[in-house]
């Protein structure tokens, strides 16, 4: 099974507001960069989308080390998701899980691979995490410009 390192990040201008996600995928000495964004979103949604998009970009099952600076993603995937699934994607107090459709998509994407999750401190000089952050900001930029243009009208 191929081994892939993935570094993800999300960014948002306002929360909610225009947002973007970025991911760096590395297999040996081959590197792929991805980014995207949405006009009206949250930072947490962008963090989730970065991980989902990166895992879905892998064409075959892989051994994956996925690095994120999001405690929300780390806690959700390692602590909370088991209870949510058991409760039909409801929280302990029977409310629908926030961003439930994205958590379900991440769960499905993860199930195709053998993923080990790693938390990295954001904005601490980790080169791949910094690059994922740059890609997230790049993914957000077109939506940020449109948001500013709408504000001037």
From Swiss-Prot:
Cofactor binding, note field: Binds 1 Mg(2+) ion per subunit. May bind a second metal ion at a regulatory site, or after substrate binding.
A biological process term (GO) from this entry: DNA replication, removal of RNA primer
Keyword Isomerase on entry: no
Chain residues that bind Mg(2+) 2: 9, 133
One term of GO molecular function: magnesium ion binding
RNase H type-1 domain: residues covered: 1-141
Keywords: Cytoplasm, Endonuclease, Hydrolase, Magnesium, Metal-binding, Nuclease
Pfam families reported in the protein's UniProt record: RNase_H (PF00075)
List of residues binding Mg(2+) 1: 9, 47, 69
EC number: 3.1.26.4
Cellular localization per UniProt: Cytoplasm
Cofactor(s) required, per the database record: Mg(2+)
Hydrolase found in the keyword field: yes
Residues making up the signal peptide according to the UniProt record: none
Function comment: Endonuclease that specifically degrades the RNA of RNA-DNA hybrids.
Protein name: Ribonuclease H
Organism from which the protein derives: Sinorhizobium medicae (strain WSM419) (Ensifer medicae)
């Amino acid at each position: 099974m191929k081994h892939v390192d993935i570094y993800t990040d999300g960014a948002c201008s306002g929360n909610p507001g225009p947002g973007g996600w970025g991911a760096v995928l590395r297999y040996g000495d081959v590197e792929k960069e991805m980014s995207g964004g949405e006009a009206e979103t949250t930072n947490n949604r962008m963090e989730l989308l970065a991980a989902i998009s990166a895992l879905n970009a892998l064409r075959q099952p892989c051994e994956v080390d996925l690095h994120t600076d999001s405690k929300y993603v780390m806690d959700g995937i390692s602590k909370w998701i088991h209870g949510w699934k058991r409760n039909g994607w409801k929280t302990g107090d029977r409310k629908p899980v926030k961003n439930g459709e994205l958590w379900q998509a991440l769960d499905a994407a993860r199930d195709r691979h053998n993923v080990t999750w790693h938390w990295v401190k954001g904005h601490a000089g980790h080169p791949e995490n910094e690059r994922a952050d740059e890609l997230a900001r790049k993914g957000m930029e077109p939506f940020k410009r449109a948001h500013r243009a709408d504000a001037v009208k």
